[in-house]
């Protein structure tokens, strides 16, 4: 039996739309074993316990590519990454499936090749890249090639995920975006993403409130998220260095200095009085990315 651990991710970082992502200390685990026949999946909703399951689909894509003849599979999922909340749950299933299949075929794929296959399934690389490589990643897809690099951000920060009790699909979140943007709005974002990356590396935190501003996606997506503006104000009032929409939402991500232990307590109080139920979870950067945890004797 194979055990795979994949971190959740937060993409976009405000102005870094579709180009930045970070792996965080929230995980999905997948246990996989080959059996004589059939597909058996547990640990997820009934509607995902079939051959349309994203983890299984991702494994099969690798098997088909290499002509691996699969008998049957038993898959168990232990997930802490909430679904459709902007924390990379789909990316974790894709990366986990590709990595598991790679182990089955004798590790014929490099991480770069796993990134290519995962991006082909996901459609864009900003979540799958950090899920594979760990850390904060800048990534660009140009034609058939994916360019990426790790960003060594200052270690003196924590991430706080504000997670609501409602979901928001990526499809719906993309539908509200305009087909074109003003030139001045593009310039607005370019300047801020450069300042944001530089400040996260240098630790010049006073720049971050401005550097996390965005005009390309958050102004449109926030209309789908109850309490959004109120939460941004509350996070900043309680010491957040920067606040941004995690992925397509609806999770909101706040960054604080590590010594600000009061942020978690204060925000828990703030969240209690909102008209939607929100939870807050403190996270740190995961620098390892997806890993094969163990190969165990015996079944699931």
UniProtKB/Swiss-Prot annotation:
Residues of the signal peptide: none
Annotated positions binding ATP: 82-92
Keywords assigned by UniProt, alphabetized: Amino-acid biosynthesis, ATP-binding, Cytoplasm, Kinase, Nucleotide-binding, Threonine biosynthesis, Transferase
GO CC terms in record: cytoplasm
GO MF annotations in UniProt: ATP binding; homoserine kinase activity
The enzyme's E.C. designation: 2.7.1.39
Highest rank taxon of the organism: Bacteria
Annotated catalysed reactions: L-homoserine + ATP = O-phospho-L-homoserine + ADP + H(+)
Compartment list: Cytoplasm
Top class in the EC scheme: transferase
Biological processes, Gene Ontology terms: threonine biosynthetic process
The family this protein is said to belong to: Belongs to the GHMP kinase family. Homoserine kinase subfamily.
Stated role: Catalyzes the ATP-dependent phosphorylation of L-homoserine to L-homoserine phosphate.
HAMAP family reported for this sequence: Homoser_kinase (MF_00384)
Protein name: Homoserine kinase
Gene: thrB
